[in-house]
Amino acid sequence: MNETGVKSDLPQPIFVPPHSGKALEFIGVTHILTTNQTGGAYYLFESVFGPGDGNQLHLHRREDEVGYVLEGALEIRLADQTVVVEAGSVAHLPKNIPHAIRNPLQTPSRYLFMTIPAGLDQWFDALDAARNAGTLDDALYRKLSLDYGIEWLE
């Protein structure tokens, strides 16, 4: 209901205070705005990579990614090039483009990522639940990845 008592189907504003998102420590991700909160429009999360941390070559079948470097730098490896983006820079990675990302520095780096459409948070949550249950191994990791449209190429 809005202030006049009339039911409204319009999206409502969301305000997220600092440090209030759900943190998934083992993968260095903090949910800021989830699939449920945005009605599936997008997912926003913060990620912290330690020195040299990152992931292997992969692609997303479902979502585009936009990354903003808050602190440090982000090294993005594509099929034929590697690009380093520094604090204040933005990177747009369309779906179906193979890429790997890592922190090239000797200090932690912080990033803000948005995926469009939403849904990647559900993959992170599934990984977190399996880890907490003690069932997360490489086979389950790869299965859950495929379930959420992520293909590991290395």
Report the location of each language-model feature:
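A hydrophobic, small-residue-rich beta->alpha segment in the mid-to-C-terminal subdomain
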Residues: R110, F124-A130
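Ligand-binding loop in jelly-roll beta-barrel domains
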Residues: T38, E75, K95-D121
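Short acidic-glycine-tyrosine-enriched beta hairpin
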Residues: F15-P17, D80-P98
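Short, conserved beta-strand element in jelly-roll/cupin
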Residues: L44-G50, L59-L78, M114
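Conserved short histidine dyad/triad with adjacent acidic residue
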Residues: P17, G28-I32, F45-H60
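Conserved hydrophobic/aromatic beta-strand scaffold that supports enzyme active sites
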Residues: H31, L44-V48, V66, T82, ...
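A short, N-terminal "cap"/entry segment at the start of jelly-roll beta-barrel domains
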Residues: M1-A41, A129-E154
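Short beta-strand segments
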Residues: N55-L57, L78-V83
